[in-house]
């Protein structure tokens, strides 16, 4: 097997319109491709793909049950949390600070956990390596 990169992360969602509003209008991810039952969001790297749960395997619980957490790097986690609170987004865990940076956890409309991470290490675009100690729950 010769995997080149992660292409997308697919979320089975209960209401694709509500999820599109959350990820596009509230979070700010641009729409890359949109079809009737599939939406790709993002610009570079892996895409976030939304697909109706009714057209996939049975939707079983939330991300705590399934172990799924989405991670977004942010420039300023405090301003991100403040903005999302104003937009009515559920803050699952407020900001904590560790050696690697600051982190908060929010919930999407289907209960998926989303980590907002502001790194303090040199490579500000680094996706991993700085999450030690940041458990979602």
Describe each region flagged by the PLM:
Residues 7-21:
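Short, basic/low-complexity N-terminal boundary segments at the transition from targeting/disordered tails
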Residues 1-7, 30-71, 81-107, 118-137:
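Vicinal oxygen chelate
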Residues 19-24, 84, 111:
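Conserved active-site tyrosine of GNAT-family acetyltransferases
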Residues 12, 71-75:
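Short hydrophobic/aromatic beta-strand micro-patches
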Residues 18-19, 77-81:
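Short, conserved charged micro-motifs
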